[in-house]
């Protein structure tokens, strides 16, 4: 048996391995180029597209929602312990001004929900559409 016949399997394996590695490298390079081109296109598209108008509510509409002091409302609903504002995650304290969001009747710190509603027209908890 000649030397080449004995090592034929090794040679075939080596060429197959080299081919697989070359295929993997080329495939990786092509994907990377596509991702860069797509990212550059997204950036360019974002620059060219007109800016969206603000989606929140205006200040007058926000101020029209009912507001009250926490001390006044604390005794209205018996059985409810400490409540917290889901926007800032702080508990309500005596003498803080709260604001009620009309369609869903959720309550928040007035300052917190005013900022939220100036950017978004939905309730921070249930995402109900807030209409003044």
From Swiss-Prot:
Question: What Gene Ontology molecular function terms does this protein carry?
Answer: transferase activity; zinc ion binding
Arranged from A to Z, the UniProt key words for this protein are: Membrane, Metal-binding, Transferase, Transmembrane, Transmembrane helix, Ubl conjugation pathway, Zinc, Zinc-finger
Could you identify this protein by its name? RING-H2 finger protein ATL39
Cellular compartment(s) = Membrane
Q: What is its EC number?
A: 2.3.2.27
* Domain remarks: The RING-type zinc finger domain mediates binding to an E2 ubiquitin-conjugating enzyme.
- State a GO cellular component annotated for this protein: membrane
InterPro entries associated with the record: RING-H2_zinc_finger (IPR053238), Znf_RING (IPR001841), Znf_RING-CH (IPR011016), Znf_RING/FYVE/PHD (IPR013083)
Please name the pathway.
Answer: Protein modification; protein ubiquitination
List the SUPFAM superfamilies: RING/U-box (SSF57850)
Signal sequence coordinates = none
Q: Which family does it belong to?
A: Belongs to the RING-type zinc finger family. ATL subfamily.
Residue intervals of every RING-type zinc finger in the record:
85-127
